[in-house]
């Protein structure tokens, strides 16, 4: 489980096509400092399992279902990604509980910056609308946000 608080911005180094998956290599000195094979790291909110961790970079295998339900399939070498290590027992927990299971991709409609925050309007896939409630939380690219004023199809987030 995760908190939705981004620890580090990593950089995709390589994507390797496997028979039934894609192996992604991400440069991430902070989140890899104590990572071991089998550990979970959220990559733009998607829970991935570390396959290898060498010299500040980790690799993980991404199956077709995950590529289809997330943006991971659009990444290229040089893409920047939000990263967070899994929660540890006894650790302070800010943010919200985030599982790292991706249900779909939203489309950004507009972005309006202000002095202390930014309001982002986006549309959700219709099949997900019933799961979103006013003042509820949702993770967008691994960052946990709260709804401020949802409308039937456009969801306003800040």
What does each of the following model-derived ranges do?
Residues 2-39, 115:
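Intrinsically disordered, low-complexity, positively charged segments
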Residues 22-23, 107-122, 126-137, 146-149:
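Intrinsic, low-complexity N-terminal interaction/targeting segments
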Residues 40, 46, 80, 84-87, ...:
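Short, surface-exposed secondary-structure boundary micro-motifs
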Residues 49-53, 88-96, 146-149:
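Short, Lys/Arg- and Gly-enriched loop/turn segments at beta-strand edges
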Residues 64, 68-105:
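Ordered, amphipathic secondary-structure segments that act as subunit-interaction surfaces
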Residues 147-158:
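Single conserved hydrophobic/aromatic residue that forms the stacking wall/gate
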């Amino acid at each position: 489980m995760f908190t939705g608080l981004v620890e580090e911005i990593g950089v995709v180094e390589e994507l390797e096509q496997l028979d039934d998956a894609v192996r992604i290599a991400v440069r991430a000195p902070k989140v890899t400092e104590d990572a071991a094979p089998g550990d979970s790291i959220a990559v733009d909110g998607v829970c991935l399992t570390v396959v290898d961790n060498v010299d500040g970079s980790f690799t993980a295998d991404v199956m077709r279902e995950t590529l289809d339900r997330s943006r991971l399939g659009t990444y290229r070498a040089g893409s920047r990604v939000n990263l967070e290590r899994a929660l540890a027992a006894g650790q302070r927990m800010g943010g919200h509980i985030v599982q790292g299971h991706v249900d779909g991709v939203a489309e950004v409609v507009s972005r309006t910056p202000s002095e202390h925050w930014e309001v982002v309007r986006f549309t959700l896939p219709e099949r997900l609308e019933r799961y979103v409630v006013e003042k509820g939380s949702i993770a967008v690219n691994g960052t946990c946000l709260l709804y401020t004023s949802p409308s039937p199809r456009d969801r306003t987030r800040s």
